[in-house]
Design a protein with these regions (language model features):
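Positively charged n-region of N-terminal signal peptides that target proteins for export
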Residues: 1-4
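Bacterial N-terminal signal peptides
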Residues: 7-17
Length: 183
């Protein structure tokens, strides 16, 4: 009886150890190297343009969708990014945002996509993570419950928005009922 009990306990322990080892070996994306990467939350990451080979790593890291905020003619753009991403089983959303004149409608489209496309893991990117970090900052503050200073600190870790983008931030905040004074 003691032998049966001991054998059963060892079998359970071995099974538990295997399950834990498999879970700890899952790719959470922590080693994924993306230009100017910001992890606003475990479900929202922003970055600069990934290389073509990075998209397979992004999929393996458990991302469900990619939102691209730049234009396809920038120097580091990946040709047919939409096809590459979709072939990997991820959603691809392209919201081209003019660098010199971001529009309130651009952010509203982004926020609507974030809210209606499920709660999966999302990578938002542009050319160098300036547009994307602003959108990530705004989304987290307005819809994600983040404190303004904490989200801003993350954005400022890669850049301080210029006058155009600071005015855009103020316009989006005001439109959403938040009193925000540009820097």
């Amino acid at each position: 009886m003691k032998t049966f009990f001991l054998t059963s306990m060892l079998s359970l322990w071995a099974a538990f150890t295997c399950v834990c080892a498999e879970a700890s070996n899952a790719d959470d994306g922590a080693d994924l190297r993306l230009l100017n990467r910001i992890d606003f939350t475990p479900l929202l990451t922003t970055s600069g343009q990934p290389a073509e080979a990075d998209f397979a790593l992004i999929a393996a890291a458990g991302y469900d969708r990619v939102i691209f905020l730049a234009f396809t003619n920038h120097p580091k753009a990946v040709g047919h990014e939409d096809h590459i991403v979709r072939e990997l089983g991820l959603q691809f959303i392209h919201i081209p945002v003019e660098w010199e004149s971001p529009k309130l409608s651009d952010f509203n489209t982004f926020a609507a996509v974030m809210q209606t496309q499920g709660s999966g893991r999302t990578l938002v990117h542009c050319e160098v993570n300036f547009r994307a970090s602003v959108f990530g900052f705004l989304y987290q503050v307005l819809f994600g419950g983040a404190e303004l200073d904490a989200a801003m600190s993350l954005m400022h870790s890669i850049w301080v928005p210029n006058d155009t983008w600071e005015a855009f931030i103020a316009r989006v905040m005001t439109d959403n009922g938040v009193d925000y004074q540009p820097l």
